[in-house]
């Protein structure tokens, strides 16, 4: 690969433990392949709140709130080798983690 290339990996998940486990696995695999790794960098957590009425017809002031949090991490791999890319492609990560890769 070219000299000043880098791979940027963004991970998203609702479960922060699963996200940290996946990020650790990616960092460990990239370091074993001989690349420079920076991260995982925690990005701001998105919080989505939904408010609904508890009763169907009346009791407007009785409401219930639900929230869902999206946790994010960023990993940069500088000067990746072909061995690094191959080992990252073979990596088996758990379901529930969204992975976005930019070259």
Curated annotation (Swiss-Prot):
Record-given protein name: Small ribosomal subunit protein uS10
One Gene Ontology term of the molecular function aspect: structural constituent of ribosome
Organism from which the protein derives: Clostridioides difficile (strain 630) (Peptoclostridium difficile)
Entry keywords, A to Z: Ribonucleoprotein, Ribosomal protein
Its job: Involved in the binding of tRNA to the ribosomes.
SMART domains given in the database record: Ribosomal_S10 (SM01403)
Top-rank taxon, per record: Bacteria
Biological-process GO terms, alphabetical: translation
Subunit structure as annotated in this protein's UniProt entry: Part of the 30S ribosomal subunit.
Pfam families, alphabetized: Ribosomal_S10
Gene name of this polypeptide: rpsJ
GO CC annotation, single: ribonucleoprotein complex
